[in-house]
A protein has these predicted regions:
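Exposed, low-structure sequence patches enriched in small/polar residues
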Residues: 1-241
């Protein structure tokens, strides 16, 4: 896993820790099995090493990661997903194990509607666990699914950055859709996308609100918000051929 300092790609991904294009030594073994109809099991183990000090480190470091996930298709368009992930990675010259457990239920029984419920727990030594629960709803209406709507509501409680939780939410085209949170708060995001008929034009908009329950300010320095609420509005207009 070697990349020259002159290498750059806007949306590059690689088989490495966090899928980043970073120079490191590593070996990964991945196994996928379908023992029964409607059951899919995936597991991998990854060993990685950095011979140069990473951010927050003063020496070289190494780590291991293990993941086991099972997906179970059920009658009437129900899908249950269970995942366990363990990572041992050095931080501040100390190796700390991190455990992540995630359960997700998805319902696609309606032709143009999707419901998804997610619960996750993150555990680490020496700190309280972090957890999050979220509910996603998506719908497509009008002819040829020209109008698409989405909504996400989430509650999270993670004591520090080490046990931060990740929440997926539909986002604008070509932008990030998974965000990390720590602290105690609520997250709401809603989006709309419309494709003009007989045209190449598409307009998308997203509104999101983060409400913190454990503080009266958000961020710090020049980006400090003197409120427990953070509002974001994004609009995108694009033309496709």
């Amino acid at each position: 896993r070697y990349y020259s300092h002159r290498f750059y790609s806007f949306q590059a991904a690689a088989i490495s820790e966090n899928a980043n294009t970073q120079s490191e030594q590593g070996v990964m073994l991945r196994v996928e099995a379908k023992p029964w109809e409607g059951v899919n099991i995936v597991s991998y183990v990854d060993f990685f090493a950095d011979y140069w000090p990473r951010y927050g480190m003063t020496t070289s470091s190494n780590g291991q990661e293990f993941m086991l996930e099972g997906k179970f298709e059920m009658p009437h368009s129900h899908l249950l997903s269970l995942r366990y992930q363990m990572k041992r990675k050095a931080a501040n010259d100390v190796i700390l194990p991190l455990h992540r457990i995630k359960a997700q239920w998805t319902f696609t029984g309606f032709e143009k509607c999707k419901l998804q419920s997610t619960a996750s727990v993150h555990l680490s030594s020496g700190t309280n666990p972090g957890f999050a629960v979220s509910q996603l709803a998506q719908a497509s209406i009008l002819r040829n699914r020209a109008l698409r709507l989405s909504f996400v509501g989430a509650y999270f409680n993670a004591p520090d950055y080490l046990t931060r939780v990740y929440i997926y939410e539909p986002s604008l085209w070509n932008s990030s859709a998974s965000y990390s949170y720590y602290g105690h708060g609520l997250r709401i995001a809603t989006g709309i996308s419309y494709t003009f008929p007989h045209s190449h034009w598409i307009i998308e908009a997203k509104y999101s609100l983060t409400h913190m329950l454990d503080r009266h300010t958000i961020s710090s320095g020049h980006q400090e918000i003197l409120s427990s609420n953070k509002n974001d509005i994004s609009i995108q207009i694009r033309m496709e051929y």
